[in-house]
């Protein structure tokens, strides 16, 4: 009987949280709030968890399904970027990526050292630039505090998204007068079936191949393989409602596990978190100078290329400002590098600790 009441209570809470999240998501999207759907889900599910004093669990199979679509979405920039375009920028981009990763890892370790409540895995994942929607999933897989990682990542995303239009407006650039549109991709029904199958089995393939962060890299690998075998004109982008569901799922996992104790802990660590976010943004801005010199591009392009996240805002400003392919190439290389490294963070931390001792 108690089990029935508990399940009935959970169904009622979800019947309020799910439509409430969708409504707030549309409102945030209309207001152009960064990461609108994820933040909407965090707000609504977090309010439910805080008001009832109980976590709001999400069905494990449904969450695994959503994680598969995160991997699919992460792979799409690789399919839309030509290999020749990437190869020209690969070495400078890798150099910039190494510096960016070093800042993120160093900042995360310092944050963990300064705030004993934060583990080293949590600190590093909260400071890695790029893939804000992916980091909470990786944090959950790696046993880090995914609530803190999510809140920190979206604090960074918000700071970058708000500052980018204001800062890049100060840099000289040539606005694009004539928009160049790529050939429209078609999406037959069987392409959608392939995407759904990849989302369902991708994490199992990743585990079978023993990939780090298998729930993300497994679907990514399958999407890239399928994309190489099938003509470019076919789109593997999930439909908009599926994207909304995927982003909402990330927010529900974070917000549904919030508590007053967790929020108080995050608030207590907020000054340190903000400081390291500012250092990360400033460090990435500094790496734009050598990139500008080596590739002979404008600082406007280099700054967008090295921006620590907010990819959609970066690409919109890049298109509006007439930036070259260096922006897309560098951002894609950095995201792939971050994903490849993130799964090895526990082993990397153990290696650093061994050398230190």
Language model regions located:
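Cytoplasmic-side transmembrane-helix entry/capping segments in multi-pass membrane proteins
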Residues: 59-71, 90-95, 117-128, 150-155, ...
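Structural signature of multi-pass alpha-helical membrane transport proteins
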Residues: 2-62, 69-82, 187-262, 282-286, ...
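Membrane-embedded alpha-helical segments of transport systems
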Residues: 99-100, 129-135, 150-169, 283, ...
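Intrinsically disordered, low-complexity non-transmembrane regions of multi-pass membrane transporters
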Residues: 1-19, 120, 145-148, 173-189, ...
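Alpha-helical membrane segments and immediately flanking helix-loop junctions
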Residues: 111-155, 297-332
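Juxtamembrane and boundary regions of transmembrane helices in multi-pass small-molecule transporters
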Residues: 108-118, 160-178, 204, 209, ...
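Transmembrane alpha-helix boundary signature
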Residues: 54-57, 76-89, 105-119, 233, ...
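Membrane-interface helix termini and inter-helical loops of multi-pass transporters
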Residues: 80-89, 170-186, 231-240, 262-264, ...
């Amino acid at each position: 009987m108690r089990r029935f009441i508990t399940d009935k209570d959970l169904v009622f809470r979800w019947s309020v949280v799910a439509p409430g999240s969708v409504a707030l998501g549309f409102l945030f999207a209309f207001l152009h709030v960064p990461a609108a759907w994820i933040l909407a889900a965090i707000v609504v599910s977090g309010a439910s968890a805080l008001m009832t004093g109980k976590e709001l669990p999400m069905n494990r199979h449904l969450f695994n399904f959503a994680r598969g679509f995160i991997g699919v979405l992460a792979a799409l920039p690789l399919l839309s970027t030509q290999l020749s375009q990437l190869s020209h920028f690969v070495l400078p981009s890798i150099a910039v990526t190494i510096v960016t990763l070093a800042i993120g890892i160093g900042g995360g370790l310092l944050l963990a050292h300064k705030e004993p409540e934060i583990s080293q895995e949590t600190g590093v994942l909260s400071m890695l630039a790029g893939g804000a929607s992916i980091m909470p999933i990786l944090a959950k897989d790696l046993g880090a505090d995914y609530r803190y990682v999510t809140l920190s990542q979206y604090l960074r995303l918000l700071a970058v998204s708000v500052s980018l239009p204001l800062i890049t407006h100060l840099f000289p650039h040539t606005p694009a007068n004539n928009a160049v549109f790529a050939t429209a991709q078609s999406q037959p029904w069987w392409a959608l079936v392939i995407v759904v199958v990849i989302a369902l089995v991708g994490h199992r393939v990743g585990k079978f191949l023993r990939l780090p962060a298998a729930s993300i890299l497994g679907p990514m690998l399958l999407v890239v393989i399928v994309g190489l075998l099938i003509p470019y004109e076919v789109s593997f982008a999930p439909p908009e409602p599926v994207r909304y569901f995927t982003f909402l799922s990330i927010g529900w996992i974070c917000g549904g596990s919030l508590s007053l104790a967790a929020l108080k802990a995050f608030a207590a660590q907020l000054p340190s978190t903000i400081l390291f976010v500012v250092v990360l943004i400033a460090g990435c801005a500094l790496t734009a100078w050598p990139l500008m010199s080596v590739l002979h591009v404008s600082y406007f392009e280099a700054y967008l290329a090295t921006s620590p996240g907010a990819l959609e805002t970066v690409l919109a400003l890049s298109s509006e400002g007439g930036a070259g392919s260096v922006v897309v190439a560098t951002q894609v290389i950095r995201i792939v590098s971050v994903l490849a490294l993130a799964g090895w963070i526990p082993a990397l931390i153990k290696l650093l600790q061994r050398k230190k001792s």
